[in-house]
Amino acid sequence: MAIYLALGDSISIDDYTGVPGGGAASQLARKLGLDLVDLTRDGNTTQGVLADLARAPTSADVVTLTAGGNDLLGGESPRAILRRLDQITHRLQPLGGHTVVNTVYDPSDGDNAIGRRELGLSRLATVELRRRLNALNGGIAKLARERGLLLADLERLCHGHGLASDEPWFVQVIEPNLAAATAIAEHWHELLTS
């Protein structure tokens, strides 16, 4: 059977959806009828994904990579995060499958007041975090173009469903709920099948 390798952080996991198998990776595996090798975990960073690659299969038909947000929240520079994402995607090339890389979403929908309140940041720190988020997402899009990877712009996909919206897609500030996971899985499916 064909293999789907999921790498990364809580964007992909089932835990916050309230439904067994509700995470984006689980939903995509079912939609595509692929065997899921799930190496995602809550709080994972790009450094963690590099380590996880040692457990990856030698081939995969589909790979999704959701990483960078926890690095960003941990104070890492976009340049350092992008360097590790470049290393990861380079190491994924021999697997031979279609790889989907993802931008980092913004649960505040661009509202710095929400970022300050929910993350306990000063105004200056919030502005700096947004600058770093924009730089990271721009770098992820560039990496996808340069490597010929599929790009899922999760920042755009999730915009309008932030914490203050009538239909928020997040719990515990940054974690995707079932609606978010479903939208992400559908977006990945569309990218992979169009």
Question: What kind of region is each of these model predictions?
Answer:
Residues 1-42, 52-59:
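Serine-esterase "nucleophile elbow" of acetyl-processing enzymes
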Residues 3, 61-64, 98:
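Structural motif
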Residues 48-83, 106-109:
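Oxyanion-hole/transition-state-stabilizing segment in secreted/luminal serine hydrolases
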Residues 78, 82-86, 137, 178-189:
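Short, amphipathic alpha-helical "lid/cap" segments that border enzyme active or binding sites
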